[in-house]
Amino acid sequence: MKLVRYGAPGAEKPAVIAMNGDGTEHAYDLSPVTDDITGEFLAADGLAAAKRALDAGDLPTVELDGQRLGAPIARPSAIICVGMNYAEHAAESGSAPPTVPIIFFKTPNTVAGPDDEAFIPRNSTKTDWEVELGVVIGKRASYLESPEQAAGHIAGYLTANDLSERTFQIEDSGGQWSKGKCAPGFSPLGPWLVPAENVDANNLRLRSWVNGEPRQDSTTADMIFPVDFLVHHLSQYLTMEPGDVILTGTPQGVALSGKYPYLKAGDIVEIEIEGLGRQRQAFAQA
């Protein structure tokens, strides 16, 4: 089961994609269950309600071909990001691997659909890509007792691109990275939200391409701090609400390494995470 939101920006409708007995996938309208895929929906055990309706045959089919897909979670109250969570990415950035998670934030209005047009910010010369595993919180998480308990607060997972402007992030930052992370549309999410029970978050292949040429190719098994640890750790410092998104870091292979040019108008970035779907952004100048 994969949850999606489709339609024009700000007017997305909920749907669910499921495998039929004949081995083919079909999309079903989820509006009999919920108006949207929100934190409130997740907190009310919405994933279980969606599965019950799907299994009962209560959902009409819907055609998604030709439809714009939005981010599969609406209006997260927070986007919490983990920096340098892959040792080789830390090395290519000129940093030692962290001994505790490095945390920064992106503003919620950076969220975009997986294939929406993306923009090089004004005055940018170093716009970069970052394929990342996104974690969507399903239950309020505060002062959790263990990583094992933290696992029960995760609704599901999605593909994310933590777009970044490196001059804004580093030279202009004053030590805080968010300046380089919060340009409009800098958090494409999706295409799907896959329930946590269907995902082995510790062994997923992540890849990215620019203009069809490979850039990143790694696995979440290489994360320094795994997902359950991160959710538990973060809960000791802040309260995560249902629908909030954690971006868990990116592997090596970004332009910051010096091995590849930064993005420019006309470039095409594609990212993919095993089982969670593929994104495609065409870049224009803001």
Residue ranges and their predicted role:
Residues 109, 113-166:
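Non-heme Fe(II) oxygenase catalytic core, chiefly the N-lobe of the double-stranded beta-helix
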